[in-house]
Amino acid sequence: MLRGSIVALITPMNEYGHVCETSLEKLINYHINNGTKAIVSVGTTGESSTLSQEEHINVVMLTLEITNKRLPIIAGTGANATSEAILLTKKFENTGISACLTVTPYYNRPTQKGLYQHFKAISENTKIPQILYNVPIRTGCDLIPETIIKLSKFKNIIGIKEATGDLSRVQKIKNSVHKNFFIISGDDTTFLDFIQLGGHGVISVTANIAAKIMSNICHLALNKNFKLARFMNNKLIPLHQGLFHEPNPIPIKWLAKKIGLIASDTLRLPMTPVSNKTRLILEKALYFSKITAK
């Protein structure tokens, strides 16, 4: 079972908008050396929506190669067409990828029946373990607990990344699924409460630049030391909040460059560079967190 701090890894690009392998390697080694438990490659934070499918696959495979079995790799493989999600997921079978993170179909807003059939089809047509991903603010549809519980019965659907921020869902899901089905927060601002209610960790944006402290907080929380975990997390709250002052991954890429983890904070359109107003917010949050240059 995946537990603890899992990073939703950014995809570093050079000034021309091409994937920067040097920065990617530096970033991955930073996580290996600072307690991150797994890497999500080319999810939302990894700019999956602006990479071609060829680039998407290449970044995941490069991440796998650099990591060299030192951490589990989870590949983002969601799509708004079920057939496309199946094809992309199958690309990672027999590669060494530990699991695929499959977001709910975005834009077309299916019913709960449609969502069930979508994930059922992926499960039945692929062998690799699947992690469901629910983030209604981005996709326009909500995978409700009752549907998650039904889907948990499929052998290769092993968990859920729950990014609604609705803490009432944690125990509702946990009390109705088998013991090996893991429930991971996808919301840095509420992840500690999420773990206290029975969750198993977080897929974190903040961890991109705060790997060690996020790993330590999760370790403390999973071992029921919530007093110290909260004390440590309090230093990160302005950062958790500031990272979503503009759409992810705009702020986190700027911060990763600022502290020297990546060489450039280049994004692809329609994502644009961070505003001066947000930079000030992020600089204050960085100072408060005491995170230093790498």
UniProtKB/Swiss-Prot annotation:
Binding site for pyruvate: 45, 203
Reactions catalysed, as given in the entry: L-aspartate 4-semialdehyde + pyruvate = (2S,4S)-4-hydroxy-2,3,4,5-tetrahydrodipicolinate + H2O + H(+)
CDD domains with a match to the protein in the record: DHDPS (cd00950)
GO BP terms, alphabetized: diaminopimelate biosynthetic process; lysine biosynthetic process via diaminopimelate
Keywords: Amino-acid biosynthesis, Cytoplasm, Diaminopimelate biosynthesis, Lyase, Lysine biosynthesis, Schiff base
Gene Ontology annotations for the cellular component aspect, listed alphabetically: cytosol
Pathway field: Amino-acid biosynthesis; L-lysine biosynthesis via DAP pathway; (S)-tetrahydrodipicolinate from L-aspartate: step 3/4
Family assignment from sequence similarity: Belongs to the DapA family.
NCBIfam families: dapA
Protein's job: Catalyzes the condensation of (S)-aspartate-beta-semialdehyde [(S)-ASA] and pyruvate to 4-hydroxy-tetrahydrodipicolinate (HTPA).
Binding partners and assembly: Homotetramer; dimer of dimers.
Protein name: 4-hydroxy-tetrahydrodipicolinate synthase
Originating organism: Buchnera aphidicola subsp. Baizongia pistaciae (strain Bp)
